[in-house]
Design a protein with these regions (language model features):
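Conserved class I S-adenosyl-L-methionine
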Residues: 1-34, 48, 72, 76, ...
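C-terminal alpha-helical "lid/dimerization" subdomain adjacent to the S-adenosyl-L-methionine
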Residues: 13-16, 133-193
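Glycine-centered, small-residue-biased loops immediately flanking beta-strands
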Residues: 37, 130
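Class I SAM-dependent methyltransferase SAM/SAH-binding core
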Residues: 40-92
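A short acidic, Gly/Pro-enriched loop at the edge of an enzyme's catalytic core
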Residues: 91-103
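A short SAM/SAH-binding and catalytic strip from SAM-dependent methyltransferases
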Residues: 102-114
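A short glycine-rich, Lys/Arg-flanked "PGG" loop and its adjoining helix->strand segment in the class I
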Residues: 116-128
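C-terminal lobe and adjacent flexible extensions of AdoMet/dcAdoMet transferase-like proteins
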Residues: 194-207
Length: 210
C-alpha cells in the first residue's frame, strides 16, 4: 500500500516542510472541539492533527487505512490516555449512527474517487447539531504547493482532484451542502478548513453495521 511505504516521508512533509501550516491547522481544528466531545478522526495519517484534538476532547477515535501511519500517530499521542487508534475505511465507517459530537477528516477528500460516499458516512455518524470538520489542501494555484503535489504523485500518490479556494467551495455546493464555513491557513501548501454543521432535521439515509 502506497501510504504504508511513504509514512516516514509524509511525516517529514507534515512536520518540517509544511509544519507551520499543519500546526496552525491543528490549532484551528482544536478550537472547534469541546471538552465534552467524543470525536472521530478519519484519515488521521501520522497524527499531525490528532495531537491537537486529543488534549481538548473527552475521547478521540483516530482512524486511518494505513497501519504504518497509525503507528506514527500513536507515538505522537502516546501521552494522551483518551485516544484509541483503529484501522478503518472512511467510506465504510463501522459504528452506529449519530455516535460522535464531531468528525474530522483531514487531507483525504482530494484523494477519494467517491468523496460523496465519505461525506455521507461522516454525516451519518455525527449527532444532530454536531460538526464535520474537513481540512483540505488547496494547492491548485500555488507554484510551491503544486510542486509538492507533483512530488507526492511521483512517489505514487494519486490525487483525484486538486482544489483552489473557489473550487473547494463549489465542491461542497455540488454535493448539496449549504452554509459551509471555510477558513484558510496559508503557507507552503495552504489548507482550507471546511466546517459543516449537521442540522437537527437532517435524516439519516444509511444504516450502521452495529
Amino acid at each position: 500500500m502506497f501510504w504504508d511505504k511513504v509514512a516516514f516521508a509524509y511525516d517529514f512533509f507534515e512536520t518540517v516542510y509544511n509544519g507551520k501550516v499543519y500546526n496552525r491547522t491543528g490549532r484551528q481544528v482544536a478550537d472547534f472541539i469541546d471538552e465534552s466531545d467524543v470525536v472521530l478522526e478519519c484519515a488521521c495519517g501520522t497524527g499531525a492533527i490528532s495531537q491537537y484534538i486529543a488534549p481538548v476532547c473527552k475521547k478521540l477515535i483516530a482512524t486511518d487505512f494505513s497501519i504504518s501511519m497509525l503507528k506514527k500517530a500513536r507515538k505522537k499521542c502516546r501521552k494522551h490516555g483518551n485516544v484509541t487508534f483503529r484501522r478503518a475505511d472512511i467510506t465504510h465507517i463501522r459504528c452506529r449512527d449519530e455516535r460522535f459530537d464531531k468528525a474530522v477528516a483531514g487531507n483525504v477528500i482530494h484523494l477519494l474517487p467517491d468523496p460523496e460516499l465519505a461525506l455521507n458516512e461522516l454525516k451519518r455518524v455525527v449527532k444532530p447539531g454536531g460538526k464535520i470538520i474537513i481540512p483540505t489542501y488547496i494547492n491548485k494555484e500555488s507554484a510551491t504547493a503544486s510542486m509538492a503535489a507533483r512530488l507526492l504523485e511521483h512517489l505514487g500518490a494519486h490525487f483525484e482532484r486538486q482544489f483552489n479556494l473557489e473550487t473547494y467551495k463549489q465542491f461542497f455546493a455540488d454535493m448539496g451542502y449549504k452554509d459551509v464555513e471555510i477558513t484558510v491557513v496559508n503557507g507552503r501548501m495552504p489548507c482550507a478548513i471546511a466546517i459543516i454543521e449537521k442540522k437537527k432535521r437532517e435524516a439519516i439515509h444509511k444504516n450502521s453495521d452495529q
